[in-house]
Regions:
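Intrinsically disordered, low-complexity, charged terminal extensions of DNA damage-control enzymes
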Residues: 1-21, 190-335
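Catalytic cores of DNA base-excision repair glycosylases
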Residues: 5-204, 208-220
């Protein structure tokens, strides 16, 4: 791969995003956590909202989890919001060495190790923050980078170690060519996101197609990497939505661990449990909701009943599944 060609391409096409105009480690970490499972346009909205309210780790640490989750609502993958709150409190723990701040500049290994010691920070996020905030040569590996490596080498099933080695080698070549680590990592990721896409690959616009073995292979670039078999488990649940005379539902806060931890919603139980049979007794089936998670399919029967006192869900952090369940129940009540 020609580092200069990729860096030149990136300089011409790089998207103007606010987290690319700062070296604040907290702002960059927040963007990386959001963008792991959220598209850029939506991530920008949530990044601005969260950074306005929590401009420092200390500001988030001082808030309770419910406020953080309420601001996170709609961004999806709610465990990220919980872990971010845990991270902020860990950074601000008076017995910890952080002093309320993310790591000071140091060696690449030291900064990456320090970041990975924090809740919810894995190798990708640590490398991204180290390279973008501190310009340290820590090569990132995400789905986009993995795809570029696989196609450049025409390797259908590269191991994690092989992908990291390739990314590290590219980083060394880029730094030797005078390219900043922050620029290089973002260039490779953007190449995978906008040109070397999973489908609809744009080889004609690729600045490094000359070195791409996937393009010249008989199978073509989209054959790489080989798709992984995906196993989706189906769970059947019963959601109980009891409404008061004003149409407000009875809501409970979910436990601090497990699916949708800390969020609010109607009681929801396994459809095959003894509790499900008892909860369905005397209530009416309002409808069904199918909800897809990354490796799980949730099929939910929504039943409705009556309660003396409900709560307005707008003021509480809820999951997108709970929002859909409540909509089915309220539509049934209004019919």
């Amino acid at each position: 791969m020609d580092p200069a060609a990729l860096a030149g391409w990136y300089a011409a096409v790089a998207r103007d995003l606010p987290w690319r105009r700062t070296r604040d480690p907290w702002a960059i970490l927040l963007s990386e956590v959001l963008l792991q499972q959220t598209q850029v346009a939506r991530g920008l909205e949530y990044w601005s909202r969260l950074l306005d309210r929590f401009p420092t780790p200390a500001a988030m640490a001082a808030a309770d989890l419910e406020e953080v989750m309420h601001l996170w609502q709609g961004a999806g993958y709610y465990a990220r919001g919980r872990r971010l709150h845990e991270l902020a409190r860990a950074v601000c723990d008076p017995d910890a060495p952080w002093g309320g701040l993310l790591p000071s500049p140091g060696t690449t290994d030291d900064v990456v190790a320090a970041l990975q010691s924090l809740p919810g920070i894995g190798p990708y996020t640590a490398a991204a923050v180290a390279s973008i905030a501190y310009d340290l040569p820590a090569a990132v590996v995400d789905g986009n980078v993995r795809r570029v490596v696989s196609r450049q080498s025409a390797s259908g099933t590269p191991s994690d170690r092989d992908v990291q080695r390739a990314a590290d080698a590219w980083m060394e070549q880029a730094v030797a060519a005078g390219i900043a680590p922050s620029v290089w990592n973002q260039a490779v990721m953007d190449l995978g996101a906008t040109v070397c896409r999973p489908r609809g690959v744009r080889c004609s616009a690729c600045p490094v197609k000359a070195s791409c073995k996937g393009t010249s292979s008989e199978e073509g670039p989209e054959a790489f990497p080989a798709p992984k078999p995906r196993r989706v488990k189906t769970e059947r649940l019963v959601a109980v939505v009891d409404l008061d005379d004003h149409g407000r539902p009875h809501l409970v806060q979910r436990p601090a661990t497990g699916r949708f931890a800390g969020l609010w919603g109607p009681p929801m139980v396994d459809a095959n449990s003894e509790d499900a049979a008892a909860l369905r007794a005397g209530r009416t089936v309002a409808g069904h909701v199918t909800h897809l998670l990354s490796h799980r399919r949730l099929e939910v029967v929504v039943v409705v009943g009556r309660t003396d006192e409900g709560r307005l869900p707008d003021a509480l952090p809820t999951s997108s599944l709970d929002d859909r369940v409540l909509a089915v129940a309220m539509d049934h009540a209004e019919a």
